[in-house]
Amino acid sequence: MRLISILSAALWVDFAVMALIKVVPSPIWFLPPTGALTLWYDKFGLAAVAADVLSLFLGVLLASFLFPGAMGLQLVMAAVFVQMLHDIFFYLVVIQGLPQGQNSMIDVFKSYANEGSWKILVADALMITSVVALARLSDLLFSYRMIAFQALLGMYSLIYITYTK
């Protein structure tokens, strides 16, 4: 799987999530509530987008490093495994470890964790699964140049949707 494919997929998955939380008035029952997510994007803008996209990108990349022969469903399972470990470790060490007021981004994560609970794990698993599937599909269907164009278009689109009410 090409790095540009993973990046493009992560950008478009984050775009889809942002479109969902900005357009759908009430959350889907198995996904976390959107109050803290809306605050996350409103307060931190493109830094929030960058953190989300990099988390997805690095999660898939780390899964491919840890499980070098994994492809298809195996890579999806590896990526979900890495994402779950990340989420749990991040919650226990960073979110619970830092006192309120020390880091404004982590303060929003504290609210998000309280608001979303286990549903965050489901949402993150769906997101990372979507990144793996979309990246693989892009590798099969498109040239490197086309995927690079898609990635740039994804970045461009994220800039605008980030500041959409």
Where are these regions (language model features)?
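Juxtamembrane/disordered regions of integral membrane proteins
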Residues: 1-118, 129, 133-165
